[in-house]
């Protein structure tokens, strides 16, 4: 054994190292089993008393992927078209047409949106300059800048927007409290987010998708808004008779402002023929343009986007919905106010220095915000100049509240009210503290795995590993006798090494990762098969067992090493360019290759040398 002293030392050191890294996983699993046997009261008391230990074990334990413990996998895409529009300092009809055409080209082809935008712009007018729309001296874009310089500026801004979005989303997820999230860039404008253990998908969607564009705006002049409402209703009247009927309906709506009337609960003898009144209840007073049921908002938006209808609205006014329902109709559908709000933004969320959840005198949640000195100065001027008027607090283009200013507010404090729950208030605080996304993001792919499905995946994965291990072990013993038993022992150590490597590098075990372990079991046995066959060939030529073992390992090494190193490089490529499940498979495959090479070449050789040289036994390899 002296000749193998170093190998034995390395093997024992690796086993101890694997034991060190796997100990938290084993202890955490036993602790989870213990907690599952406790009652709710006992569990709560135990967690409170041992919170530090439990948290430490959770952080050091081998992590399970979404497919094993449940959670959400979301792919986000940054809206580059919205970023381009925001970067533009001058937007006209030509700009919108070019952007729309570029959007269609980018959606149907391989060209990027920015390249398509520049090409479409130059196709329409080869002599025109993009700098007309994107003049920004601070960024080096002047009216003399070439289209190539503007395109480079847009690409740089798009890349920075994606990177900034990743930072903001990571901060939001951290504040949400997800353990071991995975957030990474995919391609040029996509972001992959994996959130293990989340159980409220809708809340997560709001958290990820919200741009957190907080704005303070003045409301429309009530008289001008209601006059525009009458004009728009008249525009959609099918004939003169219907217009007269609509006038009567509007007069009734103006006179009856009870809650039942506002929520559309008054009886109606027949469905109005006016397409707008069919999906919107006009209020006829104040800053409320109308009341719309949730499912009808898309139809109302389509009717109001008509350019001729937009021209009837007061200049500088747009219509925004309230964030939360104001009631329900007779069918139980949520109803929302459609409000007239000025487009001009008086203050943004950039002046907010602190946000926190508080409760009013009726114990309703609200978000209290504190502004910096500059924001407080503007807020004092804004409130002082608009006493008796509404100021809308707009977050991501929906109105959370529009309080009436009673007096000048010099303290720089404001609040978002009308929230449904503490969780909603906390989510708003989270996005405000994390900052606004540089551009809107869309969820283009979403997968949710429930905890029960994750448990089923764990059971299926363990069953596949144990079944594969048992079948391979039985075959090796049956075919290679003592040599097969040695290979089986090395196989068990191989699995311990794989799990130890994953735990040491803080990797995540996924269902494809378990598939990689099963594949590695076969590859490890394949290496032993090559060695044993070479030993049998040498014995067939009359070599002694000791000489046959030496030559068998020597001749099989090159084939084993070449095959494994090639597979390792393939796994490395998969890890570099893949995402999610592919990376999980690649990680365990690379760990398995390293472990199987060591166990097949080193560990089995130590055991052979011990049995043949030390114990002088005749070991059979079939």
UniProtKB/Swiss-Prot annotation:
InterPro entries named in the record: SecD (IPR005791), SecD/SecF_arch_bac (IPR022813), SecD/SecF_CS (IPR022646), SecD_1st (IPR048631), SecD_SecF_C (IPR048634), SecD_SecF_C_bact (IPR055344), SecDF_P1_head (IPR054384)
A biological-process GO annotation: protein transport by the Sec complex
Localization annotation: Cell inner membrane
Signal peptide span: none
Keywords from the named record: Cell inner membrane, Cell membrane, Membrane, Protein transport, Translocation, Transmembrane, Transmembrane helix, Transport
GO molecular function: protein-transporting ATPase activity
GO cellular component labels: plasma membrane
A Pfam family it matches: Sec_GG
Transmembrane segments: 6-26, 460-480, 485-505, 512-532, 559-579, 584-604
SUPFAM superfamilies: Multidrug efflux transporter AcrB transmembrane domain (SSF82866)
Cysteine disulfide partners in this protein: none
Chief site of localization: membrane
Membrane association type: Multi-pass membrane protein
Binding partners and assembly: Forms a complex with SecF. Part of the essential Sec protein translocation apparatus which comprises SecA, SecYEG and auxiliary proteins SecDF. Other proteins may also be involved.
Stated role: Part of the Sec protein translocase complex. Interacts with the SecYEG preprotein conducting channel. SecDF uses the proton motive force (PMF) to complete protein translocation after the ATP-dependent function of SecA.
Assigned protein family: Belongs to the SecD/SecF family. SecD subfamily.
This protein's name: Protein translocase subunit SecD
Originating species: Rhodothermus marinus (strain ATCC 43812 / DSM 4252 / R-10) (Rhodothermus obamensis)
Classification of source organism: Bacteria, Pseudomonadati, Rhodothermota, Rhodothermia, Rhodothermales
